[in-house]
Design a protein with these regions (language model features):
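Bacterial N-terminal signal peptides that target proteins for export
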Residues: 1-9
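Bacterial N-terminal signal peptides
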Residues: 9-17
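Sec/Tat signal peptide C-region and signal peptidase I cleavage site
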Residues: 18-22
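Noncatalytic scaffold domains of N-terminal-nucleophile
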Residues: 24-75, 79, 87-253, 258-260, ...
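Internal maturation/activation junctions in enzymes
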Residues: 43, 328-437, 587
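Active-site rim segments in enzyme catalytic domains, especially the processed small/beta chain
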Residues: 100-104, 111-126, 277-282, 430-498, ...
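Short, small/polar residue-rich loop motifs at catalytic or cofactor-binding pockets
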Residues: 293, 416-419, 483-485
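Extended C-terminal subregions enriched in glycine
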Residues: 478-480, 512, 521-568
Length: 597
């Protein structure tokens, strides 16, 4: 058992349990299990980065840095940055390798949100590459013949849950706007590794074994992950020639080679012919897909502006609400070992999640009180609810200012992710924060052309109404499902000072908010902040990270009136601080690293 808050937390996190999946209740299913899995022959730079993570200290650099979820992907991005590429160039290289070595988490068959700081203009831009509901999606897509919601995994596994992928279009759009390196060269490491093979890490092997029954339902998926009927084992060398060929098409034809032609036809055929659970995605859906530029959402916290992705992401708004409520309290004076600090953090999160469940969805379809939700007077009003000594006995959505009727029912949609986060700073001063996903671990379990297809449509509410009142996050054709992904860039005096984000389903919001508090209020460096044991409260139950000193808060939080549950809380935080150089932190619960020069 890990008993000390610092510095042994990192070493403790490296010994967390093998991958598990938790109970399947609304927003309750954990993402991927923790592992420090080594991947294959490691360079001196990777060994040094892994040692820094294990020692609980940041990786430091002067010129550029990349932090992501797998050393092979980080190395691919580092090569691009070292050769003079931008953060956008490096992101493409990182993503296409992640889609190979971490296929359960993200890839070409999924979607992503990207936050970009442009050093030349001083401007923040956010790009929405979220998956989209097909034109044939009906309001009852995830309901049975009696109008009742399907069981969650009955909806997830197969074609019904597949939305139009956005990641390839986002890669191309980011490169078009901000890239300098030749597009084809960004795929070289991904193609080489797919052709020559990579060593299956302990984490990937454990996740395959845990999900073997679902992976076995579809022949193409089974032949890749369960060769000869047995799950891939740690240490096996795995090639993916189909993925290599897909990358060659993207390298030569761009995203058009994905959204049209043979790859698009294969995607549609795979989805619509999925045995037992066919979907409704069409070639027209693929052909019409577009990346959408949206206004960044920025909320004030202390001397910082915490900026991220707006709707359909709920991440920046909910993180902003949590921090905006807590801006009314002196957390720095309380410190990380104060139960009172965690009471405030937990109940601020509950208030923010109440607003999230009522108001947040795709704002192209649903009028939203976006600015009202993060307006300081409104958040001060919400903060006043925390003045009593104990946990809130009741939590309800607030009434943010808005010039439109707000008659929405509360949503209990499930968000069960397999996700990854990338943070990059380049030599030109540009900063990228991108969270990328296929939703659940292994997505829909459907595989084509060497990559898995998402199950993103299950992020919609399965119900359309509650007690006759419409639910904002209900499914509609062309709509993008609400997400908790929270790619974040923290600004101070008009300049970026921190890039951060994480996987983790709806707990992403708590992971990111906690890490920003640890860094901004408690004086932790980025490695300490991302490694800090998790305490997360969304709907009333306080989850504390099992096997860490966070469990020591259980009795104190219980005395304050919280129900407490010790469980695995497997984030995948990757952060870069931009202050007196570059300082990178990588979550010890996963196998990622930070590299820089």
């Amino acid at each position: 058992m890990c008993s000390n808050w610092f510095p042994t937390v990192v070493a403790c996190a490296l010994t967390l349990a093998s991958p598990v999946f938790a109970q399947q209740t609304a927003d309750e299913v954990a993402p991927e299990g923790a592992s420090d899995g080594q991947v294959q022959a490691l360079t001196d730079e990777v060994i040094a980065a892994l040692k820094a993570k294990a020692d609980g200290v940041p990786v430091n650099a002067k010129t550029w840095m990349v932090a992501a979820a797998n050393p092979l992907a980080v190395e691919a991005g580092a090569k691009i940055l070292a050769a003079g590429g931008t953060a956008a160039d490096a992101m493409v290289a990182v993503q296409v390798v992640l889609g190979l070595v971490e296929p359960q988490s993200s890839g070409l068959g999924g979607g992503a949100f990207l936050v970009w700081y442009d050093a030349a203009s001083g401007r923040l831009t956010t790009l929405d590459g979220r998956e989209t509901a097909p034109r044939e999606a009906s309001p009852t897509l995830f309901q049975d013949e009696n109008g009742e919601p399907l069981k969650f995994f009955d909806a997830v596994v197969g074609g019904l849950s597949v939305g139009t992928p956005g990641t390839p279009a986002l890669l191309e759009e980011a490169h078009r706007r901000w890239g300098r390196s030749p597009w084809p060269g960004l795929f070289e490491d991904g193609i080489r590794l797919a052709d020559e093979g990579f060593v299956v890490s302990p984490r990937l092997a454990g996740l395959i074994q845990a999900d073997a029954e679902r992976l076995a339902r579809f022949p193409d998926t089974a032949s890749y992950f369960l060769p000869g009927g047995e799950p891939l084992a740690q240490g096996q060398r795995l090639t993916n020639p189909d993925y290599a060929e897909t990358l060659r098409v993207l390298a030569s034809e761009g995203a058009a080679g994905f959204y049209g032609g043979e790859i698009a036809a294969d995607i549609v055929r795979t989805v619509r012919n999925a045995p037992g659970n066919p979907g409704v995605l069409s070639g027209v859906d693929l052909a019409l897909y577009q990346v959408i530029e949206r206004e960044p959402i920025c909320a004030t916290y202390r001397s910082y502006e915490v900026c991220g992705m707006g709707p359909p992401s709920s991440g920046a708004l909910t993180v902003g609400q949590i921090l905006g409520i807590l801006d009314n309290y002196d957390l720095a004076g309380m410190g990380p070992e104060s139960a009172e600090a965690w009471r405030l953090i937990g109940d601020a999160s509950r208030l923010a999640f109440a607003d999230r469940g009522r108001y947040m969805a795709d704002s192209d379809f649903i009028p939203m009180p976006t600015q009202g939700l993060i307006d300081p007077p409104y958040l001060a009003e919400r903060a006043a609810l925390l003045n009593d000594a104990g946990a809130l006995t009741e939590v309800a959505p607030g009434n943010p200012e808005f010039d439109h009727a707000l008659n929405w029912a509360d949503d209990a949609s499930i968000e069960l992710p397999s996700t990854s986060h990338i943070s990059i700073v380049d030599a030109y001063g540009n900063v990228l924060s991108m969270t990328t996903t296929i939703e659940n671990g292994f997505g829909s379990r459907l595989m084509t052309n060497g990559f898995l297809l998402n199950n993103e449509l299950t992020d919609f509410s399965f119900r359309t109404h509650r007690d006759g009142v419409p639910i904002a996050n209900r499914i509609e054709p062309g709509k993008r499902p609400r997400s908790s992904m929270s790619p974040t860039i923290v600004m101070q005096d008009g300049f970026p000072i921190l890039a951060i984000g994480s996987p983790g389903g709806s707990r992403i919001i708590g992971y990111v908010a906690k890490s920003i508090i640890a860094w901004a209020d408690w004086g932790m460096d980025v490695q300490q902040a991302v490694a800090l044991p998790h305490l997360v409260n969304r709907f009333g139950t306080y989850d504390v990270e099992v096997g860490t000193s966070a469990e020591g808060f259980a009795d104190m939080l219980g005395e304050l009136g919280f129900e407490v549950n010790a469980r695995d809380l497997t984030s995948g935080l990757h952060a870069i601080e931009i202050r007196d150089g570059l300082h990178g932190g990588a979550d010890p619960r996963r196998e990622g690293i930070a590299l820089g020069e």
